């Protein structure tokens, strides 16, 4: 999710130039469709590269957040060593296949929804500047989450499994089992509310922070922080190391604000996999249980240090890849 939001934030800070009118059939509408297709591909590729880079950290985060009994007494780095010892090296990438399937539509929906909401907020409500980026980013993030939530649910279930204790043999089997045993279609949306409540500040703050840092940086120090885009010399883009810094700051702030909702969401998604399932049926009950049994630092914010460690490499790969893809697909 973070990677797609990072790439979307980059697109938000650099809106595409107006498309020229094309003569004959397949004019401006076709060209605009091609723009969204290119955005879809650019965002999907960037998201997949970033998520694959930090997949081992994502796996450990799920295990620590939900207090898996094999690893609940371990920290981040000791868990990174313990997982390969127990499950092999590929154990660090368990659930990543489902994430790759999810990240492409997630990125596409987020890009299109952001542009739509940004235009709607500007034209209908008369709100512009950084505020409309904050609002549109929050709404786009929530829209993308709702549309792709079942895939994230399955990914979490697969990531939580430990070798020798598999409830699901793969993505399709997980879908079938959840549908059959956990209330049909609604079983795929357990934990949606805390996810939405967490996504609103996460996506909004990510868009707002990165967009603000980028616009201020390129306005006040264009030579030091920026360079001409390879596909359009008239457009300035951030240098790679500056992208890393801005993305890291945006991600760290957004994660800190939304992390308790992320912990709550993971526990609700895991559902019957956890022994305390009946105590975590609602968002309120889940937060109360986690806080009561584990406190704030070891409960609601357990694994946050891992998210901070994930933030810099994830944002670096996402922004760098997306910058390259924007130039490759002529999006500047």
Curated annotation (Swiss-Prot):
Gene3D superfamilies: Mitochondrial carrier domain. InterPro entries: GDC-like (IPR002167), Mit_carrier (IPR002067), Mitochondrial_sb/sol_carrier (IPR018108), Mt_carrier_dom_sf (IPR023395). Solcar repeats lie at residues 34-120, 128-216, 238-328. Coiled coil: none annotated. The chain crosses the membrane at residues 37-57, 88-108, 134-154, 191-211, 244-264, 299-319. GO terms for cellular component: mitochondrial inner membrane; mitochondrion. Keywords: Membrane, Mitochondrion, Mitochondrion inner membrane, Repeat, Transmembrane, Transmembrane helix, Transport. One of its GO terms (molecular function) is coenzyme A transmembrane transporter activity. It is a multi-pass membrane protein. One of its GO terms (biological process) is mitochondrial transport. It is found in: Mitochondrion inner membrane. Pfam families: Mito_carr (PF00153). It comes from the Eukaryota. May be involved in the transport of coenzyme A in the mitochondrial matrix. Very little is known about the physiological function of this carrier. Belongs to the mitochondrial carrier (TC 2.A.29) family. This is Solute carrier family 25 member 16. It comes from Homo sapiens (Human).
